[in-house]
């Protein structure tokens, strides 16, 4: 089954064709970074207009690279939530129209579920496993029971990790997008130049949560307080110290979730999963296997959308043409985290 996937949830116009859920026939991503870089962040209206301009040429390019025509397509999958409303609307409307005109089955998928599905394109994974999704808009720690069943354990209580990278990079004039430029600078810096604090939560129910507002404040407004005077205040050292703390914030709930669930595997996905320090930090973990998608499948892409759509379509699922875009998803229930907390023995000493 050849599934054409369309992803326009943010600022990338992406189209891919995937056969039988794992064989990537084509993967086209039209990036808008040069257009948003002058604003040091994504401008939603500009993103929507670029999607309108690029969606048809990107579909044509994906078909050409796969050496296929629309007659060879067996189904269409598209992201409908969460994301920027205008951006989602472009991809969803195009997908509906194309599916209707070609009499093809159509499925609207969740962008976050698709990120986890990206790992299944290249790896043979068994459910359930612990999931960590870290991107510019989300942070989620969960147990993934199936391609459409995600049990949330924790999430960000304020800012997403990718957003923190962008904000710090923008403040210091490092460039845009912040994730890659900070990683590059950090390679020449020393993380010991500053010791930024990890977040501390008060009250119950936050064992698997993350927070980045405090780190952003420390790096941007309180650098003097946390700086090690033995080190020169360079862009490289600032980037290295910030990156080390930002990654540690993610590692702590991931390790806790693996410990508490007893599951042997974790999938780490989303744009921040492309970060080399994050990948290296878990490479030597003895108690679990951490699986990452290839870097090209960490950032927004349509391969993950097509792969997820295939799983729905072979199950016989279809979306109604009345399905709408949703900028936000329903609040994740954290009953999973509460359940695990109740199961942990009060006498046991947590390792993380």
From Swiss-Prot:
Binds 1 Fe(2+) ion per subunit. The keyword Acyltransferase applies. Keywords: Acyltransferase, Cytoplasm, Iron, Metal-binding, Transferase, tRNA processing. Its cofactor is Fe(2+). It comes from the Bacteria. PROSITE patterns: GLYCOPROTEASE. CDD domains: ASKHA_NBD_TsaD_bac. Its EC number is 2.3.1.234. GO terms for molecular function: iron ion binding; N(6)-L-threonylcarbamoyladenine synthase activity. Transmembrane segments: none annotated. It is an enzyme of class 2 (transferase). The keyword Iron applies. One of its GO terms (cellular component) is cytoplasm. It is found in: Cytoplasm. GO terms for biological process: tRNA threonylcarbamoyladenosine modification. InterPro entries: ATPase_NBD (IPR043129), Gcp-like_dom (IPR000905), KAE1/TsaD (IPR017861), Peptidase_M22_CS (IPR017860), TsaD (IPR022450). Belongs to the KAE1 / TsaD family. NCBIfam families: gcp_kae1 (TIGR00329), T6A_TsaD_YgjD (TIGR03723). This is tRNA N6-adenosine threonylcarbamoyltransferase. It comes from Treponema pallidum (strain Nichols). The gene is tsaD.
